């Protein structure tokens, strides 16, 4: 079930032959555009906490369910699942909603999309927030292997065997992924309902085509993606945030910070991949100070 905060205005856009569903809080003098992670994941998990903490601070929240997820159209054509096409989709939404220059926040996959967008449409950006993301996928994959190794050599051997045999649904493999998720995706004992709402409606066709079968195995069409060298050309004022225990770890954030010419970095010491749930007070204070 794709739960929607009733305070959002729902806007339907006709994009080529498809429908895109956008959400606009309508309130606030400063607009923040959210790009959620995934890919293929509805925007609930990112939309709801930002609405809760920012609208009463005068910040208008706009986001949308990217093509292939949530209430937007879900075509079966896998050729649609490319980062370049999503860049043009984002630019279409910006134009249709007449948003002008964006304060653009990209979380996880949304960060990869935001980086790619900034390289083509930098003049359409006011500020850029890159959250729990990276600019170099091969480097990330090496870091994920390091996180996997912390489970112990026997567990790593087991995981590699199931990945080679294609038995990723085996209970022992799934148990290892669950441990990694609670260490590096969200460290809360109970995950909020808005996370479950997104996870329960995840379009795995998009996710598996672009990324892979889970958060710790990248075999999709993004596995070689690397924009670190090009990021030196991004001059937009940028905030980079990362959790100390993040699946996209601080080393990824540091590489981006070193590449960008106008960025600052904030590490949340008690967070993994979702500091807006894990350390909301510190996270939203940092975000508000940067936006305003």
Question: Whereabouts are the PLM-identified features?
Answer:
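Active-site loop/oxyanion-hole signature of alpha/beta-hydrolase fold enzymes
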Residues: 63-109
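Catalytic active-site module of serine/aspartate enzymes centered on a nucleophile-bearing elbow/loop
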Residues: 263-292
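Flexible "cap/lid" loop of the alpha/beta hydrolase fold
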Residues: 127-167
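Alpha/beta-hydrolase
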Residues: 160-236
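Conserved loop-alpha-helix segment in the C-terminal half of the alpha/beta-hydrolase fold
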Residues: 221, 228-271
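Conserved hydrolase catalytic core segment
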Residues: 100-143
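Conserved HGGG/HGGXW glycine-rich cap/lid loop of the alpha/beta-hydrolase fold
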Residues: 19-74, 79
């Amino acid at each position: 079930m794709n739960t929607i905060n009733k305070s959002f205005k729902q806007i339907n856009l006709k994009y080529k032959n498809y429908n895109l569903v956008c959400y606009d809080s309508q309130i606030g003098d400063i607009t923040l555009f959210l790009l959620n992670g995934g890919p293929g994941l509805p925007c609930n998990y990112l939309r709801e906490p930002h609405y809760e903490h920012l609208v009463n601070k005068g910040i208008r929240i706009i986001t949308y369910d990217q093509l292939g997820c949530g209430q937007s159209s879900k075509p079966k054509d896998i050729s649609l699942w490319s980062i370049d096409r999503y860049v043009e989709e984002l630019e279409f939404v910006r134009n249709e909603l007449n948003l002008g220059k964006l304060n653009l926040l990209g979380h996880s996959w949304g960060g990869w999309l935001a980086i790619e967008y900034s390289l083509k449409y930098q003049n359409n950006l006011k500020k850029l927030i890159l959250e729990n993301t990276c600019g170099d996928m091969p480097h990330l994959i090496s870091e994920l292997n390091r996180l996997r190794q912390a489970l112990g050599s026997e567990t790593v051997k087991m995981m590699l065997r199931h990945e080679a045999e294609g038995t990723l649904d085996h209970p022992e493999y799934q148990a290892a992924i669950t441990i990694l998720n609670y260490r590096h995706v969200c460290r809360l004992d109970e995950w909020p309902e808005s996370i479950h709402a997104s996870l329960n409606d995840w379009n795995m066709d998009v996710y598996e085509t672009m990324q892979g079968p889970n958060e710790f195995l990248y075999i999709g069409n993004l596995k070689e993606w690397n924009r670190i060298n090009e990021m030196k050309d991004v001059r937009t004022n940028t905030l980079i945030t990362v959790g100390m225990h993040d699946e996209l770890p601080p080393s990824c954030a540091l590489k981006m910070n070193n590449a960008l010419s106008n960025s600052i970095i904030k590490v949340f010491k008690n967070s993994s991949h979702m500091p807006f749930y894990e350390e909301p007070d510190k996270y939203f204070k940092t975000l508000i100070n940067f936006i305003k």
